[in-house]
Amino acid sequence: MNLRPVAFILPVILASAQSVTRSRIADGYDAIRISDLRADLTFLASDALEGRLSLARGSDVAIEWIAAEFTKAGLKPVRQKVPLIEYHPDRERSHLAIDSNGKRELFRFPDAFGNFPSDITVAGSVVFAGYGITAPELHYDDYAGLDARGKIVLVFDHEPQENDPKSIFNGTGNTRYATSRVKLLNAQKHGAVAVLLVAEPNRKHPSNQERLARIAGMQQRVGRLPAQAIDGDELRIPLITVSDKIAASLLAATGKKPGDLQAGIDGTLKPASQPLPGFSAEVKNVDRDRRLADSANVLATLEGSDPALAAETIVFSAHYDHDGSAVNGEYYHGADDNGSGTVGVVSLARAYAQNRFKPRRSLLFAVFAAEERGLLGSYYYVQHPLRPLDTTRAVINFDMIGRNEAPSEQTKGLIEIALDTSNELNLVGMRYSPDYRAAVEQANQMVGLKLNYKWDDESALNVYFRSDQFPFALRNVPAMWWFTGFHPDYHQTTDTVDRINFEKMQKILRLAYLTGWTFGDEAAPPKFVENPAGSAR
């Protein structure tokens, strides 16, 4: 859609009665051109960038290209150093040892495994901490009355009442409490030395390991890629994923079956946490080929036009890294994942910089490092923000905005996908901010995309936790994932630029441009809802 041919002043209805006129937005809106999107993405997804693997040459080229494009737009790029540890977990020498009745059993991959960026051995008695959740606003605490200091803690994955629409958490889609990082930080806060994580026994979805196995070639690729972690991350204790069999053996000390324990917690919302008498454990982690290296987040700020609001920030984000090359030498081009998002942030930086008028709040354009290695660039940013998080009002995160969603091995049997998604955009995480959703829907009256919120009602794939908006949500910043969905080329060498729907990508970015104006200009920015279950009912 082009605004220039109209001769009258066309009001853009935004989040309140206030409107932004055509004359204020037209320059930037029309600057988002398909020809530019195609040219930029053709370069980023080319063989020359070698799959943009984090800490590899192609990733460095992407960093410099993004910075150069910010400079051309008249912005001053900041290369925020992201210190990383790269390593290969040694599965032969790492183990989980369970001691009981004078006997020791050793478990290794695939029965017990985890990644940790240093050689470490920790030991202690084993305690069960339910789902490992402390949610004071919900009056729920799995650690109430449990002494976890110096202990190894066994917890269920996900969260209580996962499939109950009346759940105090969510019930039709998991909240942030269901994530392993939140569980690990909570255990660390309570003095634990390690966490054993098991898929909940009454689950109605694939475990995380089963999900990964669904993606053709995933196990082969993950096995040959090095792991990475933030050097100096706030996480300091290891997490080991254990099999159902190991968990059942440990939980036998309670006198109950694992499924009965889960059902009791879900039914009463009262912790079943307790020591597991007679059991102690040792977690030993050994790595190979460990090295320290720096990557970079590429950031640029457009200052707001209102001195009273310019200290506040709206973020447009994406990640530029992908998966490098396959064992056969072919590249994982990552055109959709996430060349599309990277190009999106760059095109919006150009659009806003070119526009004669500026929003009242400042805009931060952020392209993050090492998302594919565990959201490392965005986790580093929220621990070391360029602009304060308490005045960061909204995050528009792009990750895969260039394709039509289609059934694939990852989604088969788990979620319904429409036959025609050529004009569809998924918005993920909207329950955390109804204000955010309302602003997008108002702006979309000009653009005409079909907006879909199905991923907020899904607990098997937990997509909201899997992109760079999530670290901001953990800090109570309204942050949503703009996402055109999975397809059979996801994380395959066939994710190439010739399969991109550039017309849809342009519409998505124009919608983001209008939404950014709403967030940047309106008197009241969107609010974050800490308890999304309450907001949905």
Regions found by a protein language model. Give the residues of each.
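Protein/peptide-recognition domains central to ubiquitin and immune signaling
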Residues: 39-111, 184, 197-220, 234, ...
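Noncatalytic luminal/extracellular "stalk/propeptide" segments of secretory-pathway proteins
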Residues: 24, 50-166, 275-279, 284-286, ...
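Soluble metallo-hydrolase cores and metallopeptidase-like ectodomains found primarily
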Residues: 20-25, 104-145, 229-334, 350, ...
